[in-house]
């Protein structure tokens, strides 16, 4: 698992929706941002720096700007001395409000990128929080194929040559959608959600032995692919081994841990004659039912227990007399 960071320059140059413009501190554009949370200094500007989150991006909204621009030069100098006494990665003023000259001077001297945006504070925080959540999410790479089947994101795993790509190709031909083939990039966006995607280089492509590299979007159309998908089920394809037990009732609920998240796991034996694509389709539909609270295996088990209990009572009519 990796915990990536992001440079201030990435925010400035790669996210036009933020509307950022650099005013000072260009030499600090390589500063790393390692936290998705942001901070509005607010009370800290009055001199209360207890628990000041200096390692976060500092956002100056209308309130902060109104406060510092209403101070006397002496007060503002004191505010700047205290505020810039902390190690800061970058400062952003929203609503297009220009920071006072003393802020620009300190940022230029200390190498702290100082930027402004015409976007409102609320909208800006919403935008940048989403960007940071996606960019800083814990991530890992996993060998397999990620495909959307009936709206369920399924990660097909298994040894090389077991038939993952061929199974996925058959599913795509049936109208389902490819997300990633061979290497799946997985990110944890929350405590219980994993998103799978593909690298830009491999996006929309598959490798099929005997055919080579295929562009799925060109062959099957734009509706056959998507860029990312929530991972809700792992189907592990295994070669059939005599004597090995596989779940035959569905009462077991095995899971596999990915980035600290437990994902439902199904092990499917592969042998000549088995229609794996239709098994995957059925597993997807069954997973949708389970999300709605319906579990066929448990319902059948309850009916069977009631049937056996009823039969036992009928065979022993004097037991309750």
UniProtKB/Swiss-Prot annotation:
Please list where the region (Important for the catalytic mechanism of dephosphorylation) is annotated. 269-274
Q: Which reaction(s) does the protein catalyse, per the Swiss-Prot or TrEMBL entry?
A: [HPr protein]-L-serine + ATP = [HPr protein]-O-phospho-L-serine + ADP + H(+); [HPr protein]-O-phospho-L-serine + phosphate + H(+) = [HPr protein]-L-serine + diphosphate
Nucleotide-binding as UniProt keyword = yes
- One GO biological process from the UniProt record? regulation of carbohydrate metabolic process
Binding-site list for ATP: 158-165
In the UniProt record, which is one GO cellular component term? cytosol
What are the UniProt keywords, alphabetically?
A: ATP-binding, Kinase, Magnesium, Metal-binding, Multifunctional enzyme, Nucleotide-binding, Serine/threonine-protein kinase, Transferase
Task: State the family named in the UniProt similarity comment for this chain.
Answer: Belongs to the HPrK/P family.
What does the UniProt function comment say about this protein?
Catalyzes the ATP- as well as the pyrophosphate-dependent phosphorylation of a specific serine residue in HPr, a phosphocarrier protein of the phosphoenolpyruvate-dependent sugar phosphotransferase system (PTS). HprK/P also catalyzes the pyrophosphate-producing, inorganic phosphate-dependent dephosphorylation (phosphorolysis) of seryl-phosphorylated HPr (P-Ser-HPr).
Domains as described in the record: The Walker A ATP-binding motif also binds Pi and PPi.
Subunit structure, interactors included: Homohexamer.
Q: What is this protein called?
A: HPr kinase/phosphorylase
Can you name the source organism?
Leptospira interrogans serogroup Icterohaemorrhagiae serovar Lai (strain 56601)
